């Protein structure tokens, strides 16, 4: 099966199709599974017992290949900037 890469800059990502798909970043950083989109934000959740939640701006999405939503940020950026505030405290 051939994957179709859809660049986000063309505003052609169908956001309802990314729910329950994998979210990844630079160097294959794992941001878990997309739980929902809300406004300009993609909410992902990683982990089974020790869940981490990320609130990633749609503007950082690079492409969606049908299985994975790729972002243009590193794992460190996601952990330091886009985590749930309650988890950081």
Q: Could you say what each language-model-derived stretch is?
A:
Residues 1-89:
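Peripheral interaction segments used for macromolecular assembly
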């Amino acid at each position: 099966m051939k994957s179709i890469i859809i660049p986000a800059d063309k505003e052609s990502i169908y956001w309802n199709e990314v729910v329950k798909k994998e979210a990844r970043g630079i160097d294959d950083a794992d941001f878990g599974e997309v739980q929902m989109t809300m406004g300009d934000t993609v909410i992902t959740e990683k982990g089974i017992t020790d869940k981490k939640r990320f609130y990633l701006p749609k503007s950082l999405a690079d492409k969606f290949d049908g299985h994975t939503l790729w972002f243009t940020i590193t794992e460190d950026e996601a952990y330091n900037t886009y985590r749930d505030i309650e988890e950081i405290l």
